[in-house]
């Protein structure tokens, strides 16, 4: 019986080189994306820091200083602690969309750079997964940059009780969830719809994502408390809350992990399907 033709490449010894080629190609694509990040790191910091910094500065520094803190003096102190996990989650989801969705919109639109990527010796779905991995890594960097700002800018003390094991599992999971959402949006939006994307998708996600308030405090509005469970940012924010400020009311562990894993799987499946359709169309 002849050996399978997929185990070797003509002209090369049959030592597993062919099997390792997809891994090498995946790493090369990832390195390419990270090299672009390194070259544009100044722009990366600017777009990552600006929105969270302004929000923290106004609501957690300026308002308490002028006596208009959220909830009065005691409320200002509590709000600063509530704000930190939310701002970290916002940094993750914004970066997931900016690092994955917007480049894909350009690649599938006028630049057609995606045609070069799909020529790599990789299955089409692997090219999509690489975009998610690159976006998730950028989300982690964004969270690391924003965290000190949210911690030190507020005028009132921030009370943290960091749970390292939770943080080191939930933060990467949040970054993957955000990047997977970016893949879904990037494969379904054309360049002319980008302003619409931020207006009707990103802004509602942020303001209804339990970023500026714990999900548990929505109990007086039961219909809203139920509806926002469809928002992936809720689970990301609650995950950061349970990791950084567990003394503040939060979701259960099962709900947080289950929500993020479920949304990651759903977005990844939808994103890969959309990516494949755009590539083959």
What are these regions (language model features)?
Residues 22, 31-51, 248-254, 281:
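Membrane-interface helix starts
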Residues 62-71, 94, 150-159, 187-191, ...:
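Short helix-capping/hinge motifs at transmembrane helix termini and TM-loop junctions
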Residues 46-50, 190-211:
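Pore- or pathway-lining transmembrane helices of multi-pass membrane proteins that form conduits
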Residues 6-29, 223-233:
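Short, membrane-interfacial amphipathic segments enriched in basic
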Residues 210-266:
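Membrane-interfacial helix-loop-helix junctions in multi-pass membrane proteins
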Residues 54-59, 79-153, 198-201, 206:
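Hydrophobic alpha-helical transmembrane segments of multi-pass membrane transport proteins
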Residues 124-199, 249-272:
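Alpha-helical transmembrane segments and their short interhelical loops
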Residues 2-11, 244-248, 258-281:
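Junction motif at the cytosolic side of a transmembrane helix
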């Amino acid at each position: 019986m002849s050996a399978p033709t997929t185990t070797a490449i003509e002209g090369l010894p049959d030592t597993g080189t062919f099997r390792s080629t997809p891994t090498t190609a995946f790493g090369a694509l990832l390195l390419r994306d990270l090299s672009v990040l390194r070259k544009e790191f100044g722009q990366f910091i600017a777009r990552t820091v600006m929105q969270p910094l302004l929000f923290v500065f106004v609501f957690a520094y300026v308002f308490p200083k002028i006596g208009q803190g959220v909830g009065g003096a005691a409320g200002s102190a509590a709000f600063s602690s509530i704000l930190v996990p939310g701002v970290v989650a916002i940094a993750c989801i914004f970066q997931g969309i900016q690092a994955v969705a917007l480049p894909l919109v350009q690649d599938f639109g006028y630049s057609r750079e995606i045609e070069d990527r799909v020529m790599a010796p990789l299955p089409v779905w692997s090219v999509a997964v690489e975009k998610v991995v690159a976006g998730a890594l950028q989300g982690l960097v964004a969270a690391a940059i924003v965290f000190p700002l949210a911690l030190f800018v507020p005028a009132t003390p921030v009370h943290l009780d960091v749970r390292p094991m939770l943080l080191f599992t939930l933060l990467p999971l949040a970054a993957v969830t955000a990047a997977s959402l970016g893949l879904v949006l990037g494969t379904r939006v054309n360049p002319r719809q980008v302003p619409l994307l931020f207006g009707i998708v990103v802004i509602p996600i942020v303001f209804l994502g339990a970023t500026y308030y714990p999900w548990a405090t929505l109990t007086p509005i039961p219909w809203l408390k139920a509806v926002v469970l469809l928002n992936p940012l809720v689970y990301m924010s609650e995950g950061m809350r349970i990791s950084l400020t567990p003394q503040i009311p939060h979701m259960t562990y099962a709900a947080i992990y289950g929500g993020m894993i479920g949304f990651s799987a759903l977005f990844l499946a939808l994103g890969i399907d959309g990516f494949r359709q755009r590539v083959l169309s």
